[in-house]
């Protein structure tokens, strides 16, 4: 017998057929750093680094920025013309949008003749003048125009759409200031900067309004506090703030803490001046220059009141009073009131630096006369006379003792008598030379010990 051999082939039942893997695109061959972007078809670089290949059909984008004058570094396909402009994908899209918007602006509206031509097909002619041929031609023309109008109708633009009832959005806050970029998905850098700038300006204005509101509330609460304090002071008196007499131990402790808190909150010296300058700058920035000028003028005015009217004079530097009312300041030491005279008292302020007891010009006391008048001077001889010198001091005017005055005038008389005697002797000649000269009257000369000493001329 012949044996029949049957070979059973293995089946694929129960086995998972391998799925052919799709070939992954090769990455960019940029050498300076690894780039994971896929290559362009038929090229070795991606769209970002395709300009590294000089033989690739790409060149640099022709767009030049108007702000900084730099050229776009992206790649753009080479145009057919050698000198033609070529843009990258982003700038090509922007250029297309700009051209589309410009075409919308420059496209003229529907002309009246065009509208009449389109509506002429619906005009009914008179019944008597209509013939079968004309009716057939008219019918065909109407069908042609209807088919043309249905097939070639232009799409409706945004300006031609129905805007709806304008009062429907009356309750919306942003209806008057609708942002055209509110629902945009992608923003440029300029648009983002503009949006953030507007938001920051709006936030700044809101902060300023809130700060002014808080200032108003602070002033109102301070006014109420001062009013309540005044009412309490009038009703209870100032004993609670001036002295601890009649208070309990706890109340005295609270009063002590209150005084310490007041001293702690108060500023002194340089800190007070700097705080005042800071406050003036803030007022100038918030309330404006007019309020600051008014505050400065009011702070420079004198604080004195004359007949219930405030003095309008400008105060002196570092003080709150003018020159007329500076003596009302108990802390100043540079001015004193004029004493005046017993009959007419005077209260005019005078600087202390002039003298210990200053006086105004009206009550100023002249010093005693210290120089000898011209008519009281004794001229000796017939020579040239010089004007009196202010250095000639006459001590006799200040001497109150008469004997001492006579003693002081003694040498002057002796010199005069000696000159007269000499002239007489020269006039008598030798005949009187044998006679004894007439004795001169003795006069006293003041010595060092103050006693007169007799003198004689031989």
Curated annotation (Swiss-Prot):
Glycyl lysine isopeptide (Lys-Gly) (interchain with G-Cter in SUMO2) crosslink location in chain: 78
**Is Hydrolase among this UniProt entry's keywords?**
no
The protein in question is named KAT8 regulatory NSL complex subunit 2
Q: Where in the cell is the protein located? A: Nucleus; Mitochondrion
Subunit description: Component of the NSL complex at least composed of KAT8/MOF, KANSL1, KANSL2, KANSL3, MCRS1, PHF20, OGT1/OGT, WDR5 and HCFC1.
What task does this protein carry out? Non-catalytic component of the NSL histone acetyltransferase complex, a multiprotein complex that mediates histone H4 acetylation at 'Lys-5'- and 'Lys-8' (H4K5ac and H4K8ac) at transcription start sites and promotes transcription initiation. Required for NSL complex stability and for transcription of intraciliary transport genes in both ciliated and non-ciliated cells by regulating histone H4 acetylation at 'Lys-5'- and 'Lys-12' (H4K5ac and H4K12ac). This is necessary for cilium assembly in ciliated cells and for organization of the microtubule cytoskeleton in non-ciliated cells.
Give UniProt keywords alphabetically.
Chromatin regulator, Isopeptide bond, Mitochondrion, Nucleus, Phosphoprotein, Ubl conjugation
* A cellular component term, taken from the record's GO annotations: histone acetyltransferase complex
Q: Where is the composition biased (Basic and acidic residues)?
A: 135-144
Residues where Phosphothreonine occurs? 131
Return the annotated region ranges for Required for interaction with other NSL complex members. Answer: 308-364
Specify residue ranges for compositional bias: Acidic residues. 167-178
List modified residues, type Phosphoserine. 147, 149, 168, 172, 175
- Residues of the region (Disordered) are 126-182, 419-458
Please give the biological process terms from Gene Ontology that the record holds.
Answer: chromatin organization
């Amino acid at each position: 017998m012949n044996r029949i051999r049957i070979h059973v082939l293995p089946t694929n039942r129960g086995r998972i057929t391998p799925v052919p893997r799709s070939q992954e695109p090769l990455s960019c061959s940029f050498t300076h750093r690894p780039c994971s972007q896929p290559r362009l078809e038929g090229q070795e670089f991606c769209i970002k680094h395709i300009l590294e290949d000089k033989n690739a059909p790409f060149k640099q984008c022709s767009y030049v920025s108007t702000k900084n004058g730099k050229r776009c570094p992206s790649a753009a396909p080479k145009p057919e013309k050698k000198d033609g402009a070529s843009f990258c994908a982003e700038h090509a899209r922007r250029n297309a949008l700009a051209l589309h918007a410009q075409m919308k602006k420059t496209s003229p509206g529907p002309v009246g003749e065009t509208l009449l031509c389109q509506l002429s097909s619906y005009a009914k002619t008179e019944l008597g003048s209509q013939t079968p041929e004309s009716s057939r031609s008219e019918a065909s023309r109407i069908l042609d125009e209807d088919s043309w109008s249905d097939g070639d109708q232009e799409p409706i633009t945004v300006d031609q759409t129905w805007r709806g009832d304008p009062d429907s959005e009356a309750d919306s806050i942003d209806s008057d200031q609708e942002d055209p970029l509110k629902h945009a998905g992608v923003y440029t850098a300029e648009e983002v900067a503009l949006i953030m700038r507007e938001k920051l300006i709006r936030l700044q204005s809101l902060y300023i309004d809130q700060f002014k509101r808080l200032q108003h509330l602070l002033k109102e609460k301070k006014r109420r506090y001062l009013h309540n304090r005044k009412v309490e002071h009038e009703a209870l008196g100032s004993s609670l703030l001036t002295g601890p007499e009649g208070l309990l131990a706890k109340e005295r402790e609270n009063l002590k803490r209150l005084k310490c808190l007041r001293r702690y909150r108060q500023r002194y010296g340089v800190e007070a001046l700097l705080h005042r300058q800071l406050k003036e700058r803030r007022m100038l920035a918030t309330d404006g220059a007019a309020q600051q000028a008014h505050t400065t003028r009011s702070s420079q005015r004198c604080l004195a009141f004359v007949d219930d009217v405030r003095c309008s004079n400008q105060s002196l530097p570092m003080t709150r009073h003018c020159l007329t009312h500076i003596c009302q300041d108990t802390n100043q030491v540079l001015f004193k009131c004029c004493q005046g005279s017993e009959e007419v008292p005077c209260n005019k302020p005078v600087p202390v630096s002039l003298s210990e007891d200053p006086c105004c010009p009206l009550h100023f006391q002249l010093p005693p006369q210290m120089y000898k008048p011209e008519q009281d001077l004794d001229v000796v001889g017939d020579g040239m006379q010089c004007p009196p010198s202010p250095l000639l001091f006459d001590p006799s005017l200040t001497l109150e003792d008469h004997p001492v005055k006579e003693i002081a005038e003694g040498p002057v008389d002796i010199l005069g008598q000696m000159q007269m005697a000499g002239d007489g002797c020269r006039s008598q000649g030798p005949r009187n030379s044998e006679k004894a000269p007439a004795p001169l009257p003795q006069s006293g000369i003041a010595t060092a010990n103050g006693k007169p000493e007799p003198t004689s001329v031989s």
